[in-house]
A protein has these predicted regions:
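Non-catalytic interaction/Regulatory regions outside core domains
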Residues: 1-131
């Protein structure tokens, strides 16, 4: 499945989706994005680095490492799998792909979305995508 196919799937499957994208955490680059609205290019330009910061910023990795140390775990695995953010008019879902945790699916939905359906459908896309 290509990045574009995954994004088309997210836009079609996730209720009230207004935008979807895939972020490569390794490069900090956006692999693909689709939006039904126009957004300032400056916002689109910082979406990938902002996503990387949320999942793998210095303080986040410090927290992960403290949990690992407390549990006696030696692993490169990331604990933080999904993040759900509420803004004034939108919900923003961020979730690592099952096939490659270095790729994060981003889905933006209108604020009146059923949150259970948003998470369930976004998880299905993240589970099935093989980018």
């Amino acid at each position: 499945m290509s990045a574009e196919e995954a994004i088309r799937g997210a836009m079609a499957e996730v209720p009230k989706a207004v935008a979807a994208g895939l972020v490569d955490m390794g490069s900090g680059m956006m692999l693909s994005i689709k939006t039904v609205d126009s957004h300032p290019q400056a916002v689109l330009d910082i979406l990938a680095p902002a996503t990387k910061e949320m999942f793998e910023g210095e303080m986040v990795t410090t927290i992960e490492n403290l949990f690992k140390k407390a549990r006696g775990v030696e692993s490169a695995e990331h604990y933080f799998r999904e993040i759900l953010v509420a803004s004034t008019n939108l919900w923003h879902y961020f979730g690592r792909l099952k096939s490659n945790e270095e790729i994060v699916l981003v889905v933006v939905c209108r604020a009146d979305v059923n949150l259970g359906m948003l998470v369930m459908k976004a998880r299905q896309v993240a589970h099935n995508a093989t980018v």
